[in-house]
Structure formats: C-alpha cells, structure tokens
C-alpha cells in the first residue's frame, strides 16, 4: 500500500513541478533517497530498449524542457534518455532537475538520466546551481541532496546494443564497454581518468587523441570513434556537451552525433535545440525546436561566469 500512496504523492509533486513550483526541502530529501534506491541498481552502461527519444543538455532552462516534452511527447507516453547537464547556467536548475528525478522515480523503466560534467559538486558551485539552491531554500541542503544523488547516475547507456549514449566522449583508457562496466562510479567526477573523460571529451577534426581546451578530458578523431564503434559492435556514438547551432550535428562520417537540447543557450546564443527519436527499428529522426515564449526573468543578481561553448 505504501508504494501506491507514494506514487500518488509523486504524481502531486510532478503536477506541482510542471507548473515550475519547487518542492519543499523535506520532499526533495525523500525524493533523492528513493532515486538512489533505483539508480544504485543501474549499470555504468545502462541497457535501454527502443523506441526512445534521446536528449542533450538542458541546463536549467525549465520552460524549454516543457517545450521539449510538448514536441517529443509527455513522460511516460514517450520513453526518454537524457545525456546529462540538467543544472547550471539556466535560471531554473532546481525545478528542472527535481522534475527529471521525480519522473525517474515515478517511471523508472520509461526514463533514463545519465550524468553530465555539470552533475558535480565542484562545477555546480561555480556555474549557478549552488547559488540557486541557496537563494530558493535559504541553505545548501537541497544542493547537497542532489549532488550526493549525482554520484549514483549511470555514466552511459546502450540502446538495443547498437547506439552508445553518453555526455562527453571517448577515453584513451577505455577500449570496450566492459572497461566502463568495471568503473566505480559512486564518487565525485574525478579531475582525470576514464570517468572524467566520458563526461568531458569532445570529437575533433584532427585524428588521434588531443589535449582538450576545456582542461579536462581529451579530443578524439574519426579514427578513434571508428575503431571504438567497430570493436564494440556499435553503429553510433550519441553525445551532448557541445553547443551546436542546429541542435544536432553529425561528425566523424556519421560515427558520432552531438545533440544539444537547450535552445537559445544561456538565453543569448540564438541556437535551435534538438532531440533524436529512435523508433522500434532504431531508425532516427531529429526534432528541432526553438525556445518557449519568454516569461519575465526572475530578478537575480549574478555574475555570469565565463563558459566554454
């Protein structure tokens, strides 16, 4: 019976969050506890079945996430796979990440949420989520509940054994998916090493491995992605992590696709956003969308930190 009444309570929370109204601190705490129980059973390479709709960075742009669900279909009617970066930069990180975690707890088989490089204690203290939690709750407890939960998020997902999804990119320390399965992910994102690379690396026009201008992860060339896909029986690496003006961008002779789902990123970049629908035969189509009509911005005094595009 307890499960049933919790589901009912969750439905009320989801309804409230859909109106961009935050939960109480104690509600967030119990939501995060429940989410840990679910995520702890998921793999570093979480298996996902098609049909599924794959999404890139959202970055606290709550009204644009609503637009994404309007275009792609509501959860749980549509299965979703989000590739990280739910928080920072946008004005509504709290409501955005709370809603996605609530949907995960309510419909664990219908939505997959991966870890991005912003799902980290260190990064969120610089790029907005920490300050937003302080402003909206008056203390850092909610920030702590979420950043503790972030350690449990799966690092990657595999759609029908063929399409490999993750936030950033490949790693010189990783040749096979089994290498990823063997990592201990229950920790803050390290400054270097395989787990860091999966969340920070970027594809590049130059071959081989390169030093990343981001100061973490690597750049990797087409030779690397072709070899990785071939060795692991993959048809595609799907990733996010980089702003692309059309919302999606193919590279490496279609071995890699970048998907970015925050339109007019940082409320000023003028980009479209996109999501990738995979049907039950793994045929893909991209849906592009523009920002939701702007409501008045919240009154925030903030220094906008420099950021990598």
UniProtKB/Swiss-Prot annotation:
Record's protein name: Serine/threonine-protein phosphatase 2A catalytic subunit alpha isoform
Source organism, top-level taxon: Eukaryota
Subunit structure, as described in the record: PP2A consists of a common heterodimeric core enzyme, composed of PPP2CA, a 36 kDa catalytic subunit (subunit C), and PPP2R1A, a 65 kDa constant regulatory subunit (PR65 or subunit A), that associates with a variety of regulatory subunits. Proteins that associate with the core dimer include three families of regulatory subunits B (the R2/B/PR55/B55, R3/B''/PR72/PR130/PR59 and R5/B'/B56 families), the 48 kDa variable regulatory subunit, viral proteins, and cell signaling molecules. May indirectly interact with SGOL1, most probably through regulatory B56 subunits.
Catalysed reactions, as listed in the record: O-phospho-L-seryl-[protein] + H2O = L-seryl-[protein] + phosphate; O-phospho-L-threonyl-[protein] + H2O = L-threonyl-[protein] + phosphate
EC number: 3.1.3.16
Post-translational modification: Reversibly methyl esterified on Leu-309 by leucine carboxyl methyltransferase 1 (LCMT1) and protein phosphatase methylesterase 1 (PPME1). Carboxyl methylation influences the affinity of the catalytic subunit for the different regulatory subunits, thereby modulating the PP2A holoenzyme's substrate specificity, enzyme activity and cellular localization.
Provenance organism: Gallus gallus
CDD domains reported in the protein's UniProt record: MPP_PP2A_PP4_PP6
Active site, per annotation: 118 (proton donor)
Annotated binding of Mn(2+) 2, by residue: 85, 117, 167, 241
Cited PANTHER family: SERINE/THREONINE-PROTEIN PHOSPHATASE PP2A-RELATED
InterPro entries reported in the protein's UniProt record: Calcineurin-like_PHP_ApaH, Metallo-depent_PP-like, PPA2-like, Ser/Thr-sp_prot-phosphatase
Control of this protein's activity: Inhibited by the interaction between PPP2R2A and ARPP19; this inhibition is enhanced when ARPP19 is phosphorylated. Inhibited by the interaction between PPP2R2A and PABIR1/FAM122A.
Molecular function as annotated in GO: metal ion binding; protein heterodimerization activity; protein serine/threonine phosphatase activity; RNA polymerase II CTD heptapeptide repeat S2 phosphatase activity; RNA polymerase II CTD heptapeptide repeat S5 phosphatase activity; RNA polymerase II CTD heptapeptide repeat S7 phosphatase activity
Record function comment: PP2A is the major phosphatase for microtubule-associated proteins (MAPs). PP2A can modulate the activity of phosphorylase B kinase casein kinase 2, mitogen-stimulated S6 kinase, and MAP-2 kinase. Key mediator of a quality checkpoint during transcription elongation as part of the Integrator-PP2A (INTAC) complex.
UniProt GO BP: mitotic cell cycle; negative regulation of hippo signaling; positive regulation of NLRP3 inflammasome complex assembly; RNA polymerase II transcription initiation surveillance
Binding site for Mn(2+) 1: 57, 59, 85
Sites where the protein binds Fe(3+): 85, 117, 167, 241
The family this protein is said to belong to: Belongs to the PPP phosphatase family. PP-1 subfamily.
Cofactor annotation: Mn(2+); Fe(3+); Zn(2+)
Binding site for Zn(2+): 57, 59, 85
Residues that bear Leucine methyl ester: 309
Pfam family, one: Metallophos
Major enzyme class: hydrolase
Subcellular location, record wording: Cytoplasm; Nucleus; Chromosome; Chromosome, Centromere
């Amino acid at each position: 019976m307890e499960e049933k009444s919790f589901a009912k309570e969750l439905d009320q929370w989801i309804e409230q969050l859909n109106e961009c109204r935050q939960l109480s601190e104690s509600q967030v705490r119990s939501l995060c506890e429940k989410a840990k129980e679910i995520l702890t059973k998921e793999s570093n390479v979480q298996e996902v079945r098609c049909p599924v709709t794959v999404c890139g960075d959202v970055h606290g742009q709550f009204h644009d996430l609503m637009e994404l669900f309007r275009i792609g279909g509501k959860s749980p009617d549509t299965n979703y796979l989000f590739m990280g970066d739910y928080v920072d930069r946008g004005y509504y990180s709290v409501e955005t990440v709370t809603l996605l975690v609530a949907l995960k707890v309510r419909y664990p088989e219908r939505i997959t949420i991966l870890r991005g490089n912003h799902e980290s204690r260190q990064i969120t203290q610089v790029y907005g989520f920490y300050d937003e939690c302080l402003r909206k709750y008056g203390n850092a407890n909610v920030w702590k509940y979420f950043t503790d939960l972030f350690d449990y998020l799966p690092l990657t997902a595999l759609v029908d054994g063929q399409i490999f999804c993750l936030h950033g990119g490949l790693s010189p320390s990783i040749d096979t998916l089994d290498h990823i399965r063997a990592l201990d992910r229950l920790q803050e994102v390290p400054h270097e090493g395989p787990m860091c690379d999966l969340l920070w690396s970027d594809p590049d026009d130059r071959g081989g491995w390169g030093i990343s201008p981001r100061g973490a992860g690597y750049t990797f060339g087409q030779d690397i992605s072709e070899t990785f896909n071939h060795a692991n029986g993959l048809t595609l690496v799907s990733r996010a992590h980089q702003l692309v003006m059309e919302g999606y961008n193919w590279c490496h002779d279609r071995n890699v696709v970048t998907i970015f789902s925050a339109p007019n990123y940082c409320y000023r970049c003028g980009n479209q956003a996109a999501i990738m629908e995979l049907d039950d035969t793994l045929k893909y189509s991209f849906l592009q969308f523009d920002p939701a009509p702007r409501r008045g911005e919240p009154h925030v005094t903030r220094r906008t930190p420099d950021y990598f595009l």
